[in-house]
Amino acid sequence: MKVTNASLLALLLPAVSGRFVETGEPDRSILYPDGLPQPTETGEKYHIELSPGDTRWVTEDEKWELRRSGKRFFDITDHPDLGALRAMTASRKKSVFPEKPKYQKELKPFLAELSKTEMEDHLTTFTSFHTRYYKSDYGRQSSEWLLKQVRDTIEKAGADKHVRAEHFKHPWGQNSIIATIPGKTNATVVIGAHQDSINLWLPSVLAAPGADDDGSGTVTILEAFRVILQSEDIVKGNHENTLEFHWYSAEEGGLLGSQAIFSSYEKEGRDVKAMLQQDMTGFITRTLDAGKPESVGVIVDFVDPNLTQFIKVVIDEYCSIPYVETKCGYACSDHASASKAGYPSAFVIESAFEYSDNHIHSTEDLIKYLSFDHMLQHARMTLAFGYELAFTDFAALEKPDHSDSL
């Protein structure tokens, strides 16, 4: 049976005057004191890609129906040509990465500075927004709050003369955020997470705290960003490669924010050496309930195999839990936009995909289900990944006779 937003709203009217809060969770205030917003059904169509070459036109309601059924996709309406420049290029350099980590001594004091408290404090506020749906005013407000946290982090580190953070603007209201730590070259290493959340039943009305998806990834990379700025060499730009931390808008709508960014990078000819996505980093209950050891999930489909291998050796070196290989399908998070644009990308999630958080996209995606100890493991990996690749001499690695590369 097809269920429209209008019929759902009628069913839920008696409930929406209540509060979508749990005991012990942050107060999200009375919902819509000026009256319940009406969902709009304009009949506008969106062009989506469910797999390479498999495209169709759908309404917004149909987008959410697909998402509720577990389907992921690119919404290519605004960026139908993402990757076209790559396709026109006759040859492309093979991605190469260090065979093993080499900055253990330098990283040791910084790894000790990673803080569960910092992540929890940020996530508590971040989930207090009624929703972070990218078309909502709450989504705009949460993005502005997040940019302030990133800028405050830069200022507290005394790095504001060298490091900058800006909105990457979008027409739907919630902007993406890019923090840039310039290196000696314009070769760039990107670390990303998505800042938006969604309730797939009535995105513009129902609460979507999004603690795990992807509040957890958002604060994980923010904590890695905070600590990496404690490195004087990093702040002063003594590292080889520029580091960027991205917080994408509108991932839930079909990777919209990341597509806009990587489409821009592709057209500008930006040299992105690696992109790592952190989407959902805090839920381990189903893994443990299944009798499996706590681990991080390394995605192995639709990713760059050489970058993924490098991430495995980073986890082995810097994390105290193992990794498991797992798959998530086509267009399952923002790394897919980087990959489509021709850049080596990878994705690490909280567990094997089949044991990932089953509370997402609902009012129940709450902090109480998350493990900050587990998120700390993701932060360790993220910090080490960023630091190791910041100092990597890619020009030397890419020489045909170089032996210290994957």
Swiss-Prot record:
Disulphides: 328-332
Location of this chain's protein in the cell: Secreted
User: A single Gene Ontology molecular function, please?
Assistant: aminopeptidase activity
How would you classify this enzyme at the top EC level? hydrolase
Q: Which CDD domains does this one have?
A: M28_AAP
For this protein, the record's InterPro entries field holds: M28_fam (IPR045175), Peptidase_M28 (IPR007484)
Question: Has UniProt tagged this entry with the keyword Secreted?
Answer: yes
Residues annotated as glycosylated are: 186, 306
The residues listed in the UniProt record as binding Zn(2+) 1, with positions renumbered to this chain, are 194, 213, 279
GO BP annotations of the record are: proteolysis
Residues of the signal sequence? 1-18
> Keywords assigned by UniProt?
Aminopeptidase, Disulfide bond, Glycoprotein, Hydrolase, Metal-binding, Protease, Secreted, Signal, Zinc, Zymogen
Instruction: List, separated by semicolons, the cofactors it needs.
Output: Zn(2+)
Q: Which Gene3D superfamilies would you find in this protein's record?
A: Zn peptidases
Could you confirm whether the keyword Iron appears in this record? Answer: no
Prosequence residues removed at maturation: 19-94
Please give the SUPFAM superfamilies that the UniProt record associates with this protein. Zn-dependent exopeptidases
Q: Which residues bind Zn(2+) 2?
A: 213, 252, 361
Q: Cite the EC number.
A: 3.4.11.-
Family of this protein: Belongs to the peptidase M28 family. M28E subfamily.
Q: Sorted alphabetically, which PANTHER family does this protein's record hold?
A: AMINOPEPTIDASE YDR415C-RELATED (PTHR12147:SF56), METALLOPEPTIDASE M28 FAMILY MEMBER (PTHR12147)
Question: What is annotated about its quaternary structure and interactions?
Answer: Monomer.
The name under which this protein is listed is: Leucine aminopeptidase 1
The gene for this chain is: LAP1
